[in-house]
């Protein structure tokens, strides 16, 4: 008897550990710097994006991080910066037929129940492949505020005017577009090249503010920007989430006692990005370290790093940046006939503080290399979820939906409800709804993700009518822009 009880207990533990989460960020980066859209024209680019979004929706993705400013330019209509060459093939040239990719992507994502996070590269002013800059580009109008490094042009982080300029660009995006997030990646000070120094001597003399160590000064510059960026976004629209996706190693243990047991380039020491300072001070709403290596990598082991980030970066929601191609290229060390997707996903489930995943890059999942996308849609992301909790932004929630009523229509048996009375500000407004189902005798518990059947912007849900003999209770809650959830509204039905 004891043996049987032990088996049942272990089975319950196993099932609990792999239970579907109620909240999870399931993101994908759609980049333009790989040239996938450059010069292909409006119709072809829209067709490409529609296909990618449709496939990602099937995979269970609930957030798109879309690159809109790769080199102080714009994949949206801007009065501040020129149109991107990654859109039209020539910087400063508007798309023809005219369209606004950012506005279009917002509409496409929202219609699919996805968030849209606008992704900018804050300091990079010119990539290596750009040979011609528009006359209104910042590197043309203010070359003294930039420096060249290994074929790149960089807005000098040591010049205060550049912080203000980037925040002006961001504020323009936030004010004019209904984005759900503002996202920056790992490009702060440039990735170092042996024998090549960053040319910022004069700025160090002018703007050191009493900081005598060059590295400390550079970190201070970037931290000032990150703080200002966060405050700029939330002063304009508090619900817009600010996310940062740093390089995957904060520091190596040989450089700092709190570092990871790795041997690679470091955010803190080479990119001058003090990620933990920003997280612990609340200057971002989510962090996505790019842990692009495989399990077993000698210099930067994936398992070592995901444990490190889970332990040290829990003050804000933590999502893991996954390299799809590298994941399927490398064999599972414990099961060499399979690649590493399942092994990595187990780590996501087992470790505390992991609240989601972002796929690098979207097209790799869409192309379904190694059946990566198939596994997402069939096994890992096959249930609806809410976005991770961010009550540190605001704890308030809307009131509950009203007047739940099942009605026979020409389209079937539909559960309708009425939106709650709107409050005075954004936090009290219903943005979308969560729908739960409970069989007769089941305890009503909306914390149990197994009962979540839909997340929708509609005020109705089609019921799966069968014989009309089975009794269920449907529960609907209202969600605001950051998915804070109302009290439940209930309705008993027979299906």
Summary of predicted features, one role per range:
Residues 23, 31, 35-47, 118, ...:
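Active-site-adjacent "subsite" loops/lids of carbohydrate-active enzymes
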Residues 47-74, 176-179, 277, 283:
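Catalytic domains of carbohydrate-active enzymes, especially glycoside hydrolases
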Residues 60-96:
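Aromatic-lined carbohydrate-binding/catalytic grooves of carbohydrate-active enzymes
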Residues 74-89, 124-150, 186-209, 253-265:
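Aromatic- and acidic-residue-enriched segments that line the glycan-binding/catalytic groove
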Residues 161-169, 175-184, 188-291, 296-315, ...:
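Active-site neighborhood of glycoside hydrolase catalytic domains
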Residues 272-276, 280-298, 314-392:
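Substrate-binding cleft of secreted/luminal carbohydrate-active enzymes
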Residues 371-427, 483-495:
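Pro/Thr/Ser/Gly-rich low-complexity, intrinsically disordered linker/stalk tracts
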Residues 463-486:
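Beta-strand-rich modules
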């Amino acid at each position: 008897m004891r043996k049987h009880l032990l088996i049942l207990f272990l089975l319950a533990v196993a099932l609990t550990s792999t239970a579907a989460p109620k909240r999870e960020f399931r993101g994908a980066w759609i980049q333009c710097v790989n040239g996938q859209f450059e010069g292909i024209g409006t119709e072809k680019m829209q067709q490409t994006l529609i296909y990618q979004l449709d496939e990602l929706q099937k995979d269970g993705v609930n957030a798109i991080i879309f690159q809109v400013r790769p080199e102080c330019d714009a994949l949206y209509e801007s009065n501040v910066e020129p149109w991107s060459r990654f859109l039209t093939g020539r910087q400063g040239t508007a798309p023809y037929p005219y369209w606004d990719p950012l506005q279009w992507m917002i509409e496409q994502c929202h219609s699919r129940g996805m968030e849209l996070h606008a992704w900018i590269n804050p300091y990079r002013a010119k990539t290596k492949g750009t040979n011609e800059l528009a006359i209104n580009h910042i590197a043309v109008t203010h070359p003294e505020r930039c420096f060249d490094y290994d074929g790149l042009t960089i807005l000098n982080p040591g010049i205060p005017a550049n912080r203000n300029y980037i925040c002006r660009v961001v504020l323009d995006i936030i004010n004019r577009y209904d984005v759900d997030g503002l996202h920056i990646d790992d490009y702060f000070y440039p990735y170092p090249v042996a024998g090549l120094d960053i040319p910022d001597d004069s700025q160090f003399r002018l703007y050191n503010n009493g900081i005598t160590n060059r590295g400390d000064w550079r970190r201070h510059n970037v931290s000032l920007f990150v703080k200002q960026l966060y405050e700029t976004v939330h002063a304009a629209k508090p619900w817009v989430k600010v996310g940062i996706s740093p390089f995957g190693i904060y520091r190596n243990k040989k450089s700092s006692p709190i570092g990871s047991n790795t041997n690679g380039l470091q955010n803190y020491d080479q990119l001058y990005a003090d990620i933990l300072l920003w997280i612990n001070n609340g200057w971002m709403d989510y962090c996505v370290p790019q842990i692009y290596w495989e399990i077993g990598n000698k210099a930067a082991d994936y398992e070592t790093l995901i444990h490190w980030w889970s332990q040290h970066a829990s003050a804000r929601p933590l999502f893991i940046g996954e390299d799809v191609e590298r994941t399927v290229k490398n064999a599972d060390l414990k099961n060499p006939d399979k690649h590493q997707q399942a092994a990595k996903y187990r780590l996501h489930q087992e470790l505390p503080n992991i609240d989601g995943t972002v796929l690098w890059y979207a097209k790799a999942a869409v192309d379904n290399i190694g059946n990566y996308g198939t596994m997402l849609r069939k096994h890992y992301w096959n249930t609806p979820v809410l976005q991770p909790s961010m009550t540190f932004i605001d704890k308030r929630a809307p009131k509950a939906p009203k007047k739940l009523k099942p009605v026979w229509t020409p389209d079937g048996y539909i559960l309708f409800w009425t939106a709650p009375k709107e409050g005075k500000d954004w936090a009290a407004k219903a943005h979308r709804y969560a729908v739960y189902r409970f069989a007769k005798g089941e305890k009503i518990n909306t914390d149990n993700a197994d009962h979540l059947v839909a997340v929708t912007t509609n005020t109705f849900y089609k019921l799966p009518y069968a014989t009309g003999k089975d009794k269920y209770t449907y529960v609907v809650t209202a969600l605001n822009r950051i998915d804070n959830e109302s009290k439940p509204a209930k309705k008993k039905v027979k299906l």
